[in-house]
Regions:
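N-terminal secretory signal peptides that target proteins for export/translocation
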Residues: 1-2
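Short S/T/G/P-rich N-terminal loop/turn motif that feeds into the first structured element of a domain
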Residues: 21-232
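Bacterial N-terminal signal peptides
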Residues: 6-18
């Protein structure tokens, strides 16, 4: 009887692990607005304070994240805002005040598709902002090589390996806007976890179609920026 129970337990664990490993990728049912902003000279702090406040006409109040550049690309802030399952653009737009415009040197806007808000919020640590306050985020954009979009998507969407320190991640395909195909945001619980993950990933540099090699097999361009979160 004990041996039968042990066998069933092992079988259950095997099925459970297989189910996790073969879990489908996040369903991309919703639209998000991605805003990269470079502060005007001497206005870095003020630009951050401005971007932390979601607009009064937000489609989904409270559904956003603001990340601040620490190392990487030229932009200073990235704002990712959830718009729901559909998004519209009016001719009048949402013009910023003259004071707000004076804070920005340049900005770039792109619409992407992504998971429903609860999935996105969980991956980014927004379902418990106090607990995730020390998180580190790596924001990356990729331009797929011609005919390699699906392969790049698959490579970027691979589940973290055993012992990986990634706390959450999303891969969001371009819908309209910037000259890239995918945006990925990867979250680590701390700077220590980020450093540990970076060190461990070196051993997987030449892993077939994953990490370092996968990007170079399927993308013609990419950049990575390390950030921290300033809102919410």
């Amino acid at each position: 009887m004990k041996s039968t129970f042990a066998l069933l337990l092992v079988l259950f664990l095997f099925i459970s692990v297989s189910a996790v490993q073969n879990a489908p990728a996040q369903a991309r049912t919703d639209v998000y607005h991605v805003h990269f902003a470079k502060a005007a000279l001497g206005k870095g702090a003020e630009e951050g304070d401005y971007l932390k406040k979601q607009g009064p006409n937000a489609a989904m109040p409270g559904h956003y994240i603001v990340l601040r550049h620490q190392d990487g690309e030229d932009w200073d802030y990235a704002v990712i805002e959830h718009l729901g399952t559909k998004a519209t653009v009016d001719a009048a737009g949402n013009p910023a005040s003259a004071a707000a415009r004076a804070l920005s040197a340049w900005h770039a806007d792109t619409f992407v598709s992504g998971p429903a808000w609860p999935e996105f919020a969980h991956a980014m640590g927004l379902d418990d902002t106090a607990k995730s306050a020390g998180s580190v985020y790596v924001v990356s954009v990729y331009r797929a090589a011609p005919g390699h979009r699906e392969e790049l998507d698959k490579s970027l969407s691979q589940a973290p390996g055993t012992g990986d320190t990634v706390a959450g991640s999303v891969v969001m395909p371009h819908v309209e806007g910037g000259p890239w195909t995918f945006l990925s945001v990867t979250r680590y619980n701390s700077w220590q976890d980020f450093a540990t993950g970076e060190k461990a990933s070196v051993a997987d540099t030449l892993k077939p179609d994953g990490g370092w090699l996968g990007v170079r097999n399927h993308a013609t361009y990419h950049n990575d920026t390390i950030t921290d979160r300033i809102a919410p």
